[in-house]
């Protein structure tokens, strides 16, 4: 039983209401949504596990809230004593409860953001959103370009219909929530949205409330922990589920909104159905960089699976289209086609495997006759892919299926032209246009799969070939000799190797991947990305291997520059590549380059990485212009600020001028996929943000930095890099401190991804993946990779010359790149709490390292103060009270999980740590007691004391949910 005086203790929702700031507008229901969900959850908790457990959860929450009010470290100790006194089952239940609360808080926030946005659209009021830079919609952007910036409507239309945003979904292991829970969360979100609709009846409200409670209980009763790591095929299926649930219907809905927005600036045309505004690609099953589980067989499987899913989605809609296009009037072109198809079909033909239109369609329904043939081929396309996926072969001939998107679209275009010719354009611009836009966007493969591989793996293959040919060791050759040999082979026609080539397992894997690319239809694939690319030979090597493996339609080859030195050398490498006549002829005036935000940040710290990424883009674009090449930048951004994350619109608008120019590729990783596409409104908003920001950047580029700003940035970057590397790579105590002070070593137990946390099993920070590196610091709310280096750079230049402070403030107020960079770090400080890191040190770190931790926390505080000084703010987030409120609502439950995590890690790492466990407090009924016991038994193979490992994992997941990112 909880020991505090519960009569004096405020309920959780009462405490929530106290957090409501005075300035919140009438349409802001976030506190109300949050309180409703928590009230429902606490009632469920009491029903399932008794009043004592509910009171304990409330007591824990109150202690955390008291700490958040005064930041008294004694409250953390009091909280720790209470938490460590819980038995194994109760400990899991408390951690699970707070993790659940934070997931519910996220859902309340998503519903509120959608509601707030809709209300602002109705009122046309964006005054409190700094011109809505984070929420801008397409109509607002078009009006701004035409009415404020005096662009002609036709100029805007031409730019829009020719631009492309390619969103690349990746399986980066940052989505810590199981798909089973994501689906339940979606239903909770829908219930909450409907509950606050204005036209709801009392009966509707009662039924929705029951449904809400049912889904909250179902989510709480679901095991949050993945008991086995997902396979790449699992990741692919999870990623593809977003297409089925939101993206598939979201794209035509969004394009209709674009049509409406164009009409409102005087353009009476619709966006052409084949305009490439939005494209989708994927790395799921294609990204083999450091992931041995992504094999050639996996790549083949995911391509066939995506092809089957695409055919199935089209097939599920074609009968609706047949019902809609029932008219008999058509043009001669369609009539001739319909009569041919009708004559060639068997008399009295029946198709019992169809639900509708299973008998032969009469010739006086010409649209249905033509669409019926489309349906037949879609059915065969789906079945052939299914056979190939399950059996490896199919008796359905390829000519009975659709093999390219042009032949699929041909019949649809025929119907569209006929309707327009007969005066039925309004009908043509309905479901048929939506369907054609889907076909143009998703093709026959749903997404295009990128292949990613390390450059060293290609070098190993070519080394084996040159040794087999007895012409030397490719690995030992200079760059010049490599290029000379590669170009001579690319210019010739002789095959380089046959079946007698000696192959290690690694070499066979690389070659078999190329063979899979050659075997499958070319529209399955997008780019071939080379990670750790440093020289032109890295690109030419892939070109040669594609030819040797008989790939008829070679993939475009994209070098990925990640580390600071590689980014600095990238422009020169690209210039050398463009100087090669053979290569310039090959690319036909188009090149793509990928830049990595994660590894550059881990290598040099956020400040220097951000500035080098900015400069590299400018220089790469200049090189491309010099050689007459159109360059597309592919941004490898993660969800966290440490890995290049941040609000989409701001991120795009802060890129250097001329670097997007109507063509953008960007990764959508892990938990960001759910945040972007988890629900229809989120999907719609994501498509709007990317399209609007890309258009605005191209037509109204941000300012270029002044020469004196550049000089100051260069100076600060040197200081920031030195500060960052002196601690992370050169400080001999750092690796030991990092592994003791954070849950980095325990990260792999979450089973959130298919790939290992390290590129190589041994080694220090260099071999650690960027995601677990950021994840570990996010969990302790210290965020070291984000801010380390900023403070030292600011301090040095301000001490050198006080005028530099004025210049920094000028840069913040006038230069979007600098402002966005600092604002994102400020947001991270709003989420941070060095006292949590200090508690971790006292519990988990050896005493001789305590002064080192104190030193880092002093740097944290110094950086925070300098950041506020440069931004001209008195306190963190003073310019964004809405975001400040949203973060404050999370602090108490996150703090609870921080404390549970710290003490659980102590018990895991130090078996001699004594705790006095009180009797179980969850309800004493046989059923409830059994429930708590079963929670402990869900992990029977744990090497630790009962309940500890699951409690730890639940805290990791809950903190990730509360911080709204993992790695």
Swiss-Prot record:
<comment type="similarity">
    <text>Belongs to the PEPCase type 1 family.</text>
</comment>
<feature type="modified residue" description="Phosphoserine">
    <location>
        <position position="11"/>
    </location>
</feature>
<keyword id="KW-0456">Lyase</keyword>
<dbReference type="GO" id="GO:0015979">
    <property type="term" value="P:photosynthesis"/>
</dbReference>
<feature type="active site">
    <location>
        <position position="172"/>
    </location>
</feature>
<keyword id="KW-0021">Allosteric enzyme</keyword>
<dbReference type="GO" id="GO:0008964">
    <property type="term" value="F:phosphoenolpyruvate carboxylase activity"/>
</dbReference>
<keyword id="KW-0120">Carbon dioxide fixation</keyword>
<dbReference type="Pfam" id="PF00311">
    <property type="entry name" value="PEPcase"/>
</dbReference>
<dbReference type="InterPro" id="IPR021135">
    <property type="entry name" value="PEP_COase"/>
</dbReference>
<dbReference type="InterPro" id="IPR018129">
    <property type="entry name" value="PEP_COase_Lys_AS"/>
</dbReference>
<keyword id="KW-0597">Phosphoprotein</keyword>
<dbReference type="GO" id="GO:0048366">
    <property type="term" value="P:leaf development"/>
</dbReference>
<dbReference type="GO" id="GO:0006099">
    <property type="term" value="P:tricarboxylic acid cycle"/>
</dbReference>
<protein>
    <recommendedName>
        <fullName>Phosphoenolpyruvate carboxylase</fullName>
        <ecNumber>4.1.1.31</ecNumber>
    </recommendedName>
</protein>
<feature type="active site">
    <location>
        <position position="602"/>
    </location>
</feature>
<dbReference type="InterPro" id="IPR033129">
    <property type="entry name" value="PEPCASE_His_AS"/>
</dbReference>
<keyword id="KW-0963">Cytoplasm</keyword>
<dbReference type="GO" id="GO:0015977">
    <property type="term" value="P:carbon fixation"/>
</dbReference>
<keyword id="KW-0460">Magnesium</keyword>
<keyword id="KW-0602">Photosynthesis</keyword>
<comment type="subunit">
    <text>Homotetramer.</text>
</comment>
<comment type="function">
    <text>Through the carboxylation of phosphoenolpyruvate (PEP) it forms oxaloacetate, a four-carbon dicarboxylic acid source for the tricarboxylic acid cycle.</text>
</comment>
<dbReference type="InterPro" id="IPR015813">
    <property type="entry name" value="Pyrv/PenolPyrv_kinase-like_dom"/>
</dbReference>
<dbReference type="InterPro" id="IPR022805">
    <property type="entry name" value="PEP_COase_bac/pln-type"/>
</dbReference>
<dbReference type="GO" id="GO:0005829">
    <property type="term" value="C:cytosol"/>
</dbReference>
């Amino acid at each position: 039983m909880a020991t505090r005086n519960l009569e004096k203790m405020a309920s959780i929702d009462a405490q929530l209401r106290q957090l409501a700031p005075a300035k919140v507008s009438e349409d802001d229901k976030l506190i109300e949504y949050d309180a409703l969900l928590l009230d429902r959850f606490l009632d469920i908790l009491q029903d399932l596990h008794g009043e004592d457990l509910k009171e304990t959860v409330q007591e824990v929450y109150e202690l955390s809230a008291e700490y958040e009010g005064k930041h008294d470290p004694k409250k953390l100790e009091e909280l720790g004593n209470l938490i460590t006194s819980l038995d194994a089952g109760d400990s899991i239940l408390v951690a699970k409860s707070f993790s659940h609360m934070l997931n519910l808080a996220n859902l309340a926030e998503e519903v509120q953001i959608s509601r707030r946005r809709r209300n602002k659209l109705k009122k046309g009021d964006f005054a409190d959103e700094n011109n809505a830079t984070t929420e801008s919609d397409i109509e607002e952007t078009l009006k701004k370009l035409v009415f404020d910036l005096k662009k002609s409507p036709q100029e805007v239309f031409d730019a829009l219909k020719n631009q492309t945003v390619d969103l690349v979904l990746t399986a980066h292991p940052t989505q810590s929530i199981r798909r089973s829970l994501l689906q339940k969360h979606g239903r909770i979100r829908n219930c909450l949205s409907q509950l606050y609709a204005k036209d709801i009846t009392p009966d509707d409200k009662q039924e929705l409330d029951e449904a809400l409670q049912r889904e909250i209980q179902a989510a709480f009763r679901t095991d949050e922990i993945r008991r086995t790591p997902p396979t790449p095929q699992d990741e692919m299926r999870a990623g593809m589920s977003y297409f089925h649930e939101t993206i598939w219907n979201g794209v035509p809905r969004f394009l209709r909104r674009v049509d409406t927005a164009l009409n409102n600036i005087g353009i009476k045309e619709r966006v052409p159905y084949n305009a490439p505004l939005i494209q989708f690609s994927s790395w799921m099953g294609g990204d083999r960089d450091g992931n041995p589980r992504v094999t050639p067989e996996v790549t083949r499987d995911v391509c066939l699976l995506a092809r089957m899913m695409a055919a199935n989605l089209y097939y599920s809609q074609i009968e609706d289209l047949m019902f809609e296009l029932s008219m008999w009037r058509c043009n001669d072109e369609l009539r001739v086609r319909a009569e041919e198809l009708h004559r060639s079909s068997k008399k009295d033909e029946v198709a019992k495997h169809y639900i509708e239109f299973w008998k032969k369609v009469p010739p006086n329904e010409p649209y249905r006759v033509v669409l019926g043939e489309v349906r037949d081929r879609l059915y065969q396309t789906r079945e052939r892919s299914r056979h190939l996926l399950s059996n490896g072969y199919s008796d359905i001939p390829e000519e009975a299926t659709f093999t390219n998107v042009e032949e699929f679209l041909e019949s649809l275009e025929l119907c569209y032209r006929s309707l327009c010719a007969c005066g039925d354009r309004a009908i043509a611009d309905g479901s048929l246009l939506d369907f054609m836009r889907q076909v143009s966007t998703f093709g026959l493969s749903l997404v295009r799969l990128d292949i990613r591989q390390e450059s060293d793996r290609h070098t190993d293959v070519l080394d084996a070939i040159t040794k087999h040919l007895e012409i030397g060791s490719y690995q030992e050759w200079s760059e010049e000799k490599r290029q000379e040999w590669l170009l001579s082979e690319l210019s010739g026609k002789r095959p380089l190797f046959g079946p007698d080539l000696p192959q290690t397992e690694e070499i066979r894997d690389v070659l078999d991947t190329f063979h899979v690319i050659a075997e499958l239809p070319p529209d399955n694939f997008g780019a071939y990305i080379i990670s750790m690319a440093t020289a032109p030979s890295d690109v030419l090597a892939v070109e040669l291997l594609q030819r040797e493996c008989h790939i008829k339609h070679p993939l475009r080859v994209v070098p990925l520059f990640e580390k600071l030195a590689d980014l600095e050398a990238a422009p020169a490498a690209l210039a050398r590549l463009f100087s090669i006549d053979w290569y310039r002829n090959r690319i036909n005036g188009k090149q793509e380059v990928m830049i990595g935000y994660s590894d550059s940040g881990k290598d040099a710290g956020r400040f220097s990485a951000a500035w080098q990424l900015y400069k590299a883009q400018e220089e790469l674009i200049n090189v491309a212009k010099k050689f007459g090449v159109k360059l597309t930048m592919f941004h490898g951004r993660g969800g966290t600020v440490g890995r290049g994350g941040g609000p989409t619109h701001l991120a795009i608008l802060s890129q250097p001028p001329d670097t997007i120019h109507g063509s953008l590729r960007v990764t959508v990783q892990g938990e960001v996929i759910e945040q972007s596409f988890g629900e229809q409104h989120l999907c719609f908003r994501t498509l709007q943000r990317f399209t609007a920001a890309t258009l605005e950047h191209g037509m109204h580029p941000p300012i270029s930095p002044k020469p004196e700003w550049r000089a100051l940035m260069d100076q600060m970057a040197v200081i920031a890099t030195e500060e960052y590397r002196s601690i992370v790579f050169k400080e001999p105590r750092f690796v030991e401190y990092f592994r003791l002070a954070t849950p980095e070593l325990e990260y792999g137990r979450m089973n959130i991804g298919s790939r290992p946390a390290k590129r190589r099993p041994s080694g220090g920070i260099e071999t650690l993946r960027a995601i677990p590196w950021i994840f570990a610091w996010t969990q302790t709310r210290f965020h070291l990779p984000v801010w380390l280096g900023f403070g030292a750079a600011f301090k040095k230049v301000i001490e050198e010359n006080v005028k530099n402070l004025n210049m920094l403030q000028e840069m913040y107020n006038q230069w979007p790149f600098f402002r966005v960079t600092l604002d994102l770090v400020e947001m991270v400080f709003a989420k941070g709490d060095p006292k949590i890191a200090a508690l971790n040190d006292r519990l988990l770190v050896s005493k001789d390292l305590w002064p080192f931790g104190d030193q880092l926390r002093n740097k944290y505080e110094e950086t925070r103060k300098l950041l506020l000084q440069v931004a001209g703010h008195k306190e963190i987030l003073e310019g964004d009270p809405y975001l400040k409120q949203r973060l404050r609502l999370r602090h108490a439950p996150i703090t609870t999980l921080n404390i549970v995590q710290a003490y659980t890690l102590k018990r895991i790492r130090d078996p001699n740590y004594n705790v006095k466990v009180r009797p179980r407090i969850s309800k004493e009924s046989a059923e409830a007691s059994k429930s708590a016991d079963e929670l402990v038994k869900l992990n029977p193979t744990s090497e630790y004391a009962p309940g500890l490992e699951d409690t730890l994992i639940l805290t990791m997941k809950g903190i990730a949910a509360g911080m709204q990112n993992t790695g």
